UniProtKB/Swiss-Prot annotation:
This is Threonine--tRNA ligase. Residues 1-61 form the TGS domain. GO terms for cellular component: cytosol. Its cofactor is Zn(2+). It catalyses: tRNA(Thr) + L-threonine + ATP = L-threonyl-tRNA(Thr) + AMP + diphosphate + H(+). Keywords: Aminoacyl-tRNA synthetase, ATP-binding, Cytoplasm, Ligase, Metal-binding, Nucleotide-binding, Protein biosynthesis, RNA-binding, tRNA-binding, Zinc. Pfam families: HGTP_anticodon (PF03129), TGS (PF02824), tRNA-synt_2b (PF00587), tRNA_SAD (PF07973). Binds 1 zinc ion per subunit. Belongs to the class-II aminoacyl-tRNA synthetase family. Its main location: cytoplasm. InterPro entries: aa-tRNA-synt_IIb, aa-tRNA-synth_II, aa-tRNA-synth_II/BPL/LPL, Anticodon-bd, Anticodon-bd_dom_sf, Beta-grasp_dom_sf, TGS, TGS-like. Catalyzes the attachment of threonine to tRNA(Thr) in a two-step reaction: L-threonine is first activated by ATP to form Thr-AMP and then transferred to the acceptor end of tRNA(Thr). Also edits incorrectly charged L-seryl-tRNA(Thr). The gene is thrS.
Amino acid sequence: MPVITLPDGSKREFSNPVTVLDVAADIGPGLAKAAVAGKVDGTLVDCSHVIDKDAELAIVTERDAEGVEVIRHSSAHLLAMAVQSIFPSAQVTIGPVIEDGFYYDFAFERPFTPDDLVKIEEKMQELSDADLPVTRSLMSRSEAVELFKKMGEEYKVEIIASIPTEENLSFYSQGDFIDLCRGPHVPSTGKIKAFKLTKVAGAYWRGDSNNAMLQRIYGTAWGNKKDLKAYLHRIEEAEKRDHRKIGKKLGLFHMQEEAPGMVFWHSDGWTLYQVIEQYMRKQLRKHDYKEIKTPQVVERTLWEKSGHWEKFRDDMFTTQSEDRDFAIKPMNCPCHVQVFNQGLRSYRDLPLRLAEFGSCHRNEASGALHGLMRVRGFTQDDAHIFCTEEQIQEEVGKFIDFLHEVYADFGFSEIIYKLSTRPEKRVGSDEIWDKSEKALADALDAKGLPWEELPGEGAFYGPKVEFSLKDCLGRLWQCGTVQVDFSMPGRLGAQYVSDEQVRKTPVMLHRAILGSFERFIGILIEHYEGAFPSWLAPTQVAILNITDKQADYCKKIGEILNDKGFRVRLDLRNEKINYKIREHTLNRVPFLAVVGDKEVETQCLAIRTRQGEDLGVMSISAFEELLQNEEAKRSRS
């Protein structure tokens, strides 16, 4: 007689074992109709899952995040079924859920075309309308291998053979389609109501370029048509804001095949980069960091001591000189420890905050590269705080304040906080993990910040907090992080003399706010669609003459504003003024100063914004004040 405890605390007693769907029906027919899965004692299960003992149960519907996840997983199976219905020779491989959607990889003799995607999506809709039951079954490994060999599914046979277990394997069927899967899945295909296939791309089997090239079909699925429509609108907006397109249009940067994953910064893009760097440098001084600079190429022995050679060797660019192995640094931390190690430190020196705009390189797979968002050469706003265990919470609290200030200045006010705690394999005692996790949690709580715990997601050497900012499209970008490290200082011999005159190893906090300059600039480009706030804009004001008679006055204004540190562009071309205004507006210049005879006579400027707002005629000093006010408020409204 299982007793089922529901999320509101109420209990329901049953005389026999029941399924999740039985319980939903007992609560009400509406809930039974809406159910896509269940959570039994915190574990996500099928609606057909049998409960034969006391348990806590939550019915999962399309309104729940877990419900949407199940719908997406089942959509991948629906996609595979549709493809094999139209193209029987296509072999299925894997079809996982990804952020906002799903994909499935197929082995097929030719690439799928856009017309193919239309047909496949129509078939998916047909199969959804058929409302086919989705059923779970178990097979032994040998039975499964035999079945999929008969079906000609070589990739599934390989997957099954690679599973290190003799236990029965679970399979899901709908109609005549069957797939190996842990589940859970929706109870019937009719639950998959809002989906869209988005694109097709090539993908190597198991991500290895030595293996066969497969066809990967991407799609998105949601709990209802309204959410799907909203998502497709966001995608359309994201495409309009693609930093690669805008970067090219505004002449900010380019990338080319001869230097994959490396950025060619153009004048305006480099100006933007420098504005950000100068801003961050000023903030570092304000928050008592010491800026350092360390070598880019370091001998293998240091990377072996730090552990990077063993764990990241394949991601490092290496070279040789005079029979010695060197690596271009993929990160800055081991070099920062070397700076700390110069001279014997005292507890009075702690906390010591060392910062670097560190140029790093990682040998990312070429298929993973994506504009500024995923590169091989990048600069981190990196810093490492050497402190005692007792100082962790205070230092993390100060860092959070620093991070909030920076994000607000760049126009980001919504931040998501996630605390990753100890994994199974780790270094350090439980006592120091307890202290460190509590210090991070207490630092977040002291600021009144909501945070989510990610159990087991910390690095082997310490827990961390990740900070993700939300952009204007509601997308999350994980940029900031603060990471406790118990391992590296000891591995590299970092020590300080305590107040008891005993040599101790400091704790090291890895921290970054922007993450990398390149990726952060990509985020800014998309967030602002290239229309940067005045303080960031490569050109803050364009001075436009109406005729040649005003050229000298325009040059004079340009000199005055340049001398005050503003970024000015003179446009003295013999073009119609409306043409100039349109061109600089399209180039997203925040302010346009139009100069005609009247402005020369009154020693003023006619100011308008890129939005077309006429700010009227103002003196040079009044315009300077306007620009200064824009600088002062930065991106804050």
